[in-house]
Amino acid sequence: KRIEEKTDTLGLHFTQPTIHEYGEYVYISMAGINSWLTNPDEPQLPCFMTTLSYPLGTRIDAVTYAIETPQKITLPKQIIPLSQPLPLDRLYHSSKRLPSSRIYNETSPYPGDYMSYQITVGLEDNQPVIFLSLQVYPFQYYPKINRGEYIQDIEIEISYKPASKNLNMPDIYDLLIITPALFSDNLQ
């Protein structure tokens, strides 16, 4: 029996970015985001994260996206880098913002793509499932020329083949021990 491929579509909308002054830097906000890129010394950029779940045994074949032509925006200052994490102790520590030369001297965009994803396996409601975690980056930053590009709409398409049968795991397992033949007599 041939399993038909299915497609899920997720459409997201973001507003035009707002530029906020922050000392010698700026930061960007956009309605429609729910998180930020949080890598120390790298630009603090808006992002949207969501996780979808599929029954165990589902094969995710492709995750693609479509966007309109990105809009360009010139920034008055560099985007603020995230500070280094501070230790959890009772001493005073000043937060340091050290722009990563690896990123801030680049002519290519950061983070580099409008979407990334990971496929993992875990439990949801105590049942094994496939998790598809999506990260959408509606703002791309060109640090060397202090310019940004942003999108307001993205359509994500997930192509997958559903599980061919229910892969529920039994509650009781037999014990399987894999060992060299040298030890097999001791295990019996």
Which ranges hold each PLM region?
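Extracellular pro-sequences of secreted precursors
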Residues: 1-188
